[in-house]
């Protein structure tokens, strides 16, 4: 699926996007994600990839000196602009996370939530994160997974997804914590924290630092 097709898939329901996400994975998991993000330290100058409607932008921005909230979808960006308003620390703009307009070593931190598992080439995305981060920069990833879920819970979540979104994109991945950590290491990151969060539904939460030798 091309970048344009991916954009079209996730852009179909901008006004109900958050409700659909909560229906599929549950409010409990979303609340746990917010709790983890609230524990993050200062993140400096940050870019958020796949900001969607800005649901996590609100949580991340207090941790930053300034931030870019970016997405490939015009319709989701429009919702994010309404949600965030004219926040003095936030610049909302359209970006392709696989090939951004940011200069090399321009930012202190990269944050993405529920993006890498729907990207056709996660390794390309991680390489772009590495490129734009300053030395010792921080990469924070949260992404849904079915690893560690009971079979019946997987089935029910799958049915909720199809009911909400239809057939998932063919390149959707369900990454394990070990696989994602390995991919990040291959891209030049040292893993600082990694865990699986959630009960009936799950998400990976992992923080990496750009290799000090970079």
Regions found by a protein language model. Give the residues of each.
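Class I SAM-dependent methyltransferase SAM/SAH-binding core
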Residues: 47-99
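A conserved beta-strand element that flanks and buttresses the S-adenosyl-L-methionine
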Residues: 111
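Conserved class I S-adenosyl-L-methionine
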Residues: 1-41, 55, 59, 83, ...
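Core SAM-dependent methyltransferase catalytic element
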Residues: 187-189, 193-214
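A short glycine-rich, Lys/Arg-flanked "PGG" loop and its adjoining helix->strand segment in the class I
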Residues: 123-135
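Short glycine-centered segments of the SAM/dcSAM-binding site in methyltransferase folds
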Residues: 45, 137-138
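Short catalytic micro-motifs in class I SAM-dependent methyltransferases
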Residues: 114-115
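C-terminal alpha-helical "lid/dimerization" subdomain adjacent to the S-adenosyl-L-methionine
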Residues: 142-187, 192-197
């Amino acid at each position: 699926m091309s970048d344009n097709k991916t954009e079209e898939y996730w852009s179909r329901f901008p006004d109900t996007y958050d409700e659909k996400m909560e229906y599929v994975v549950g409010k409990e998991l979303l609340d746990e994600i917010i709790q983890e993000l609230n524990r993050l330290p200062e993140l400096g100058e940050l870019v958020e990839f796949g900001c969607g409607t800005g649901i996590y932008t609100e949580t991340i921005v207090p941790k930053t000196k300034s931030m870019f909230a970016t997405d490939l979808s015009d319709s989701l960006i429009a919702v994010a602009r309404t949600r965030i308003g004219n926040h003095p620390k936030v610049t909302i703009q359209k970006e392709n996370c696989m090939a951004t307009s940011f200069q090399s070593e321009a930012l202190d931190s990269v944050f993405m939530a529920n993006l890498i598992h729907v990207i056709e080439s996660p390794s390309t995305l991680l390489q772009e994160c590495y490129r734009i981060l300053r030395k010792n920069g921080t990469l924070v990833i949260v992404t849904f997974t079915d690893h560690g879920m009971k079979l019946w819970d997987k089935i029910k979540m799958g049915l909720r997804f199809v009911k909400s979104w239809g057939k998932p994109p063919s390149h959707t991945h369900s990454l394990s914590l070990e696989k994602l950590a390995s991919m990040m290491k291959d891209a030049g990151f040292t893993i600082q924290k990694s865990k699986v969060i959630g009960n009936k539904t799950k998400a990976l939460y992992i923080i990496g630092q750009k290799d000090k030798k970079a």
